[in-house]
């Protein structure tokens, strides 16, 4: 199974890239973690945020291979504990499809992305900077994998 993180934004700070890659390399070959970056629309004083979100959403949806299970990261989503995420990861594996996880930009996800999602995951009730979300999601997925495989990374 492939876990595909589709995120708005390119040119992340070095610590974000290093953090994401640290967890990405820990995954086994049979559960690869891939990152697809979508260029963020130009924002400014007079920017049309609705149009920017729409364009970002179109690009995100175009990056999803047909048949993938889609999970949006969004505040109204489900708050998962680590064991609940591990259970979700097992269900995704048993489903036999690859999984695309969608991370929006500063204003969140486009409505079309939310509508296309099979599931919605609320990472935190806190407002997190979208670059940090990449690292937290990668670590959370790795931790869930470690729970499922009895790897010593996760400790109760």
Swiss-Prot record:
- What name appears for this protein in its UniProt entry? Ribosomal RNA large subunit methyltransferase H
What this protein is reported to do is described as: Specifically methylates the pseudouridine at position 1915 (m3Psi1915) in 23S rRNA.
* Gene name of the encoded protein: rlmH
One Pfam family named in its UniProt record: SPOUT_MTase
The organism's lineage is: Bacteria, Pseudomonadati, Pseudomonadota, Gammaproteobacteria, Alteromonadales
- Which species is this record about? Shewanella baltica (strain OS155 / ATCC BAA-1091)
Mind telling me which PANTHER family this protein's record contains? METHYLTRANSFERASE (PTHR33603), RIBOSOMAL RNA LARGE SUBUNIT METHYLTRANSFERASE H (PTHR33603:SF1)
Q: Which InterPro entries match?
A: Alpha/beta_knot_MTases (IPR029028), RlmH-like (IPR003742), tRNA_m1G_MTases_N (IPR029026)
Its localization reads:
Cytoplasm
Catalytic activity reads: pseudouridine(1915) in 23S rRNA + S-adenosyl-L-methionine = N(3)-methylpseudouridine(1915) in 23S rRNA + S-adenosyl-L-homocysteine + H(+)
């Amino acid at each position: 199974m492939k876990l595909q993180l589709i995120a708005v934004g390119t040119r992340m700070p070095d610590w974000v890239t290093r953090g994401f890659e640290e967890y990405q390399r820990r995954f086994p070959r049979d559960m690869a973690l891939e990152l697809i970056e979508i260029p963020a629309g130009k924002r400014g004083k007079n920017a049309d945020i609705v149009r920017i979100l729409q364009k970002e959403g179109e690009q995100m949806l175009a990056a999803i291979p047909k048949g993938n299970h889609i999970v949006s990261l969004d505040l109204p989503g489900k708050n998962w504990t680590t064991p609940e995420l591990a259970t979700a990861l097992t269900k995704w594996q048993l489903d036999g499809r690859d999984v695309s996880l969608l991370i929006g930009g500063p204003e969140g996800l486009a409505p079309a992305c939310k509508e296309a999602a099979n599931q919605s995951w609320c990472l935190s009730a806190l407002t997190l900077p979208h670059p940090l979300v990449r690292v937290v999601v990668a670590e959370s997925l790795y931790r869930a994998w470690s729970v499922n495989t009895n790897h010593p990374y996760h400790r109760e």
